Amino acid sequence: MGKKEMIMVKGIPKIMLLISITFLLLSLINCNVLVNSRGTRRSWPYTVLSYRGKEILKKQKEDILKRLMSTSSDGYRFLMYPSQQKFHAIVISMDKFPQDYILAGPIRNDSITHMWFDFYSTQLRKPAKYVYSEYNHTAHKITLRPPPCGTVPSMNCLSEMLNVSKRNDTGEKGCGNFTTFNPMFFNVPRWNTKLYIGSNKVNVDSQTIYFLGLTALLLRYAQRNCTRSFYLVNAMSRNLFRVPKYINGTKLKNTMRKLKRKQALVKEQPQKKNKKSQSTTTPYLSYTTSTAFNVTTNVTYSATAAVTRVATSTTGYRPDSNFMKSIMATQLRDLATWVYTTLRYRNEPFCKPDRNRTAVSEFMKNTHVLIRNETPYTIYGTLDMSSLYYNETMSVENETASDNNETTPTSPSTRFQRTFIDPLWDYLDSLLFLDKIRNFSLQLPAYGNLTPPEHRRAANLSTLNSLWWWSQ
């Protein structure tokens, strides 16, 4: 046997060893897959369905349609003409929990789950139409309550979600003392745009878009700790945004911290000093409260008048050190619900192109109700906004406990005043800012070259009184 043949013979056991190890690894992988396939695994929600999965979903919808058609003649009319017929309820049997839905409340396996269910099948070549439904887990039946609101996004579905939130009977519960970030930022670029909510165009400002978008992320993330809360407001957000189901908490917190730092006071540039004159200096500029000028509907501007402007480096937005502090998650939910109601007043017929632009708008009238009443009445009904207010302690001169019922016996020089939480305060102050811009734009064609008004955040209620509709 030659030397070359000896090398080949010695290499044969090594090749066989590698082949046997490969087969062993493949067998272990196959066994692991087999074990996992037997267990109950939760399917990944973002995977594309295979052909078999699509066929199974199609058969499920066909079965639902057959049961709906076989109930009565109302079922046929409800299916073919959903917007023209009104019924109290249609009950059909359903063995499994549906897939195409938007939750209106938590999933309760021992009772009823409220949702908006898409009852149209894909083979009908029609857009998705959501109808408010109640699924009974114990009886394995679903109750459809027509008429459907339509597609999502749409103004009809947003209005129906606001109507359901007014009743508050979907099983939602409070979230205790869980806090979150305040997304009502004041120091943001100001611009207006038109959003398409379905086929409806809505005029929205930039601060409202920032607030609603960040609120959708924060409340979706808050459901990790509050599993029975925020379903209705998250359903409303689907009419404006595409919020992912799973949110990276670390990225969200870092983003909110960066945005929060941009709202703080402007830092002063440190100056070089000699060793002899070293002293303690304040890292921030001193905040001086300045009353904003009064703006009315008949204000006049003079083109030759000297306008004093505050330097950008000295502009402060909040005199205290607790600016942009955390708020309760339930307060954020209530404020977001209120802002969603204002979208209806920015749409037709309340916002026609040929409207009287100098008259009081329906949007301002609706906001004025919130200022004067903690349970304001809207076109969707009465909403409870009491969580957006708190008792603020204010000093009282020459007043005793017997003179005023609001004065506490232990501190006769102080009393409580009902005021707004920070997000609502910033929201109202932004209306003051927009009102200045509105009056400036009305006077600009008549007077030509004018300097835009400077605005500082309102530091007290007397500054907010500059709103021309405040005292009405």
From Swiss-Prot:
Signal peptide, first to last residue: 1-31
PTM description: N-glycosylated.
Keyword presence, Glycoprotein: yes
Glycosylated position list: 109, 136, 163, 168, 177, 225, 248, 294, 298, 356, 391, 398, 405, 439, 460
Keyword check for Signal: yes
GO process terms (BP): host-mediated suppression of symbiont invasion
Described function: Plays a role in viral entry into host cells. Forms a trimeric complex at the surface of the viral envelope together with gH and gL. This complex is required for entry in host fibroblasts. Mechanistically, engages host receptor(s) including PDGFRA to mediate infection.
Family that this chain belongs to: Belongs to the herpesviridae U47 family.
Protein name: Envelope glycoprotein O
High-level lineage: Viruses, Duplodnaviria, Heunggongvirae, Peploviricota, Herviviricetes
Gene that this sequence comes from: UL74
